[in-house]
Amino acid sequence: EAICGVSPVLMRPPGGYIDTRSLSVVGNMGMSAIMWSIDTRDWQHRNAQRTIDTVLSQVRDGDIILMHDIYSTSADAAVVLIPELTARGYQLVTVSELAAYRGGAAPGHKYSQFR
């Protein structure tokens, strides 16, 4: 909050690991835990085409896609995926925008998609 000027309301647990106790703490802090419905495993294979294929074969409305911006292959995949998903009728939004559109995210709850 001191750095960005607002209190965070969403958090992604490192590695996607969160237990009941941690989720309770997150909720007491007014936050929801955000997971993902499509894991591209881009960190493991570092292959742009494989990332593209994974997303395009699995994507559905309301999905949260996990990709890591620290790999050039993930950035290369995004350059292809963004126009392709848009052409298929998807609107790319932030998780906050997606949650708000689908009724919001309750503190102390875990979400991997919003449908």
Name every feature range the model reports, one short phrase each.
Residues 1-112:
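Catalytic domains of cell-wall/extracellular-matrix polysaccharide-remodeling enzymes
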